[in-house]
Amino acid sequence: MLQHSLSQAEAQARLNLAESQDGFFAKVRGSATNRLARRNCTYEAWNDQSLAAKAAALLDPEDQVDIVILDPSAEGGMPHTRPGLICLPAYYPESKLKETLAHEMIHISQKRQPTLWAARASNEGWSPVREVLPEFWASRLRLNPDTFGTLYAWEKRYVPLPVYIREDKPILREIEVRWFDIKEGIVKGSPPTTFTQTHGPLGHVQAEHPYELWAYSK
């Protein structure tokens, strides 16, 4: 039996509420590079929310999360989370729903229980970054609604930086992870040896932030 889905107006209202809670797009608007990366993206609730009902049927009702279907161009067509919401692009393949929802529910937990996940970060060698990043690199960081808020350093020294490959023509899906060495004050192209020894070789989507690392290794 399919679950109830929100109307387009209800879905848009949930998005507006989420923005009032996390201020993600206020931050995007304050970043020239991130605004440019979303120049062809429309972040609005889609007129057909029926996919949300199919996705909701795969979740436990106790998860207490709403699913919103967005314009297919929103966030480059990438599923993501906002406070209390899982956001999926229109026309997302139903065959991928189960795996994607499991991934996004990890991010929902990270938003709802920040203290718990901060403790895990500390236990696994991560610490919040207090230092100011070099402006050249800070301006190129791709803002991600799933990890928005806190940068982490591996071994209190190495900060993964998900940066756009091209600053002049940034594309949301085209990033690379550089590593800022706090001690040396320089940015390196390869992860520290200890990180690779611990986690193995990772793609950029896993390496960009510990929250993504854990969501992909669910």
Residues covered by each model-derived region:
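N-terminal mature-domain "stem" immediately C-terminal to a signal peptide or N-terminal signal-anchor/transmembrane
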Residues: M1-Y43, Y211
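Auxiliary, metal-adjacent structural segments of Zn-dependent hydrolase domains
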Residues: R29-P83
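Active-site scaffold of zinc-dependent metalloenzymes
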Residues: P61-V65, L70-A102, I106, K111
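Serine-dependent carboxylesterase/thioesterase catalytic core
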Residues: Q110-R120
